[in-house]
């Protein structure tokens, strides 16, 4: 039997909606990364963008286990001497763009290259419940029901 290799015309992309309310960040990010890459499909082809389009809502309500909310820090450098800066995940979640925490977590689970960048373009993350993709009729994926560890109450 020959190995299946999809052609661009055979790729079928679906739209998936995930509610991040109360979900653990790392477990959520790994599910999103798998869906973006298309590894959940039997027709997965490593060199093609065969993953689905993923919409994540309620990004500000994502949970972090342990002390990661204050201990995990995103660093960057301004380019000036002594210009190292940093913000904790908690500060970012409480700030203006809480969706960046999910985007960064998924970005680090997807390959770094031209294909990975194209796959990351299929991810849309929104802080609240509203999203402009109702016309695509996304199907809801319940990540919390997959494993009890995926959801945190407190």
From Swiss-Prot:
Kindly give the CDD domains that the UniProt entry links to this protein: Ribosomal_L13 (cd00392)
Q: Keywords, A to Z?
A: Ribonucleoprotein, Ribosomal protein
The family database entries (SUPFAM superfamilies) matched by this protein are listed as: Ribosomal protein L13
**InterPro entries in the cross-refs:** Ribosomal_uL13, Ribosomal_uL13_bac-type, Ribosomal_uL13_sf
GO molecular function terms attached to this record:
mRNA binding; structural constituent of ribosome
Q: Which GO terms describe its cellular component?
A: cytosolic large ribosomal subunit
| Family annotation (Pfam families) | Ribosomal_L13 (PF00572)
Q: Name one GO biological process term.
A: negative regulation of translation
What family does the Swiss-Prot or TrEMBL record give for this protein?
Belongs to the universal ribosomal protein uL13 family.
Q: What does this protein do?
A: This protein is one of the early assembly proteins of the 50S ribosomal subunit, although it is not seen to bind rRNA by itself. It is important during the early stages of 50S assembly.
Q: How does it assemble?
A: Part of the 50S ribosomal subunit.
Q: What is this protein called?
A: Large ribosomal subunit protein uL13
Source organism (scientific name): Rhodospirillum centenum (strain ATCC 51521 / SW)
Gene of origin? Answer: rplM
């Amino acid at each position: 039997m020959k190995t299946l290799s999809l052609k661009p015309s055979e790729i079928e992309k679906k739209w998936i909606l995930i509610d991040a309310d109360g979900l653990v960040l790392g477990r959520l990010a790994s599910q999103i990364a798998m869906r973006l890459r298309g590894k959940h499909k039997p027709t997965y082809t490593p060199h093609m963008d065969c993953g689905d389009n993923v919409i994540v809502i309620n990004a500000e309500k994502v949970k972090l286990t342990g002390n990661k909310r204050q201990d995990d820090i995103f660093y960057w450098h301004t380019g000036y001497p002594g210009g190292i800066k940093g913000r904790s995940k908690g500060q970012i979640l409480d700030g203006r763009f809480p969706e960046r925490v999910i985007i960064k977590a998924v970005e680090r689970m997807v390959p770094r290259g031209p294909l990975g960048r194209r796959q990351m373009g299929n991810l849309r993350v929104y802080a609240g419940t509203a999203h402009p993709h109702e016309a695509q009729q996304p199907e809801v994926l319940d990540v919390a029901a997959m494993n009890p560890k995926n959801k945190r109450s407190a």
